[in-house]
Amino acid sequence: MNANPLFPAILLILPGLVQAAIPAATDRAFADFTALPLELLPVLEGVTDRDSAEQSAEKLNALLPRVYDSRTAMTRIETLTPEVKRELLQKYEKDMRTNWGKVYEQIFRLQNRRCYNSLAFFKQFHALCMMLEK
């Protein structure tokens, strides 16, 4: 039999390499999703009247593809082991809750103000809310 002496070592190393690739991609997704509110907040907080809502509509529209991509990447968490899920939540949960909590405060504020009657802003705002709901 012609067995490669490195074969047992490869079998021990390979699972670690395969598992490491999945958390790295998911780790990036979590980092992006956690940081995304820091880009959204200035746009949402800047809306204080109809004129500022009109100006913010374009800025919000520019951010929507990032919201969609980040949200889509986050769905990959379901394919991970419970241990990896737990580790990622320990790493990001506090910042994620804090950052997204601030975004939701702004969403509720803007809903109560009816987006300051700006149709342009309302369209982008509605798209943002729909993306976050799924």
Predicted regions, residues:
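Bacterial N-terminal signal peptides that target proteins for export
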Residues: M1-F7
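N-terminal signal peptide c-region/cleavage motif recognized by signal peptidases
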Residues: P15-V18
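Immediate post-signal-peptide N-terminus of mature secreted/exported proteins
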Residues: A20-E58, M130-K134
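Compact alpha-helical subdomains of small soluble proteins
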Residues: L64-K134
